[in-house]
Amino acid sequence: MNYPIDYVPPKIWKWENENGGTFASTNRPIAGSTHDKALPIGQHPFQLYSQGTPNGIKVTVMFEELLEMGHSDAEYDAWLISIGKGEQFGSDFVNINPNSKIPALLDNSGDEPKRVFESGAILLYLAEKFNSCLLYTSDAADEELR
């Protein structure tokens, strides 16, 4: 990227106005919820809040694979978070994921609820929790093949 020679980055970045179309506000440079909204809670220990985007689908696939492998304690409830409507900025969702991004997982299977967010972190968390070979590192995969 080329900047003018006299360009000096500001000491404090300020968001002056929205630009970028419909989804510009989904990556806003401020934190916290914009409105109060309770999230639904189902009957299973795992509550997945997501949408059918590539990152959102990854966790659903992981849960389904765990169930197919016989991990019946991997039952989960999946709830739609419509990022087009800004539902990721609701108070309960932000309490689970302060980054206001999908997917977000609430694990109620232990004594205390655990919140896990970011698709990669959720996948690793589930792989470790269920001692699953689905996400072995290359060293672990090599060991598994021996």
Q: What do the predicted segments below correspond to?
A:
Residues 1-138:
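GST-like domain detector, emphasizing the conserved glutathione-binding G-site
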Residues 136-146:
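Single conserved hydrophobic/aromatic residue that forms the stacking wall/gate
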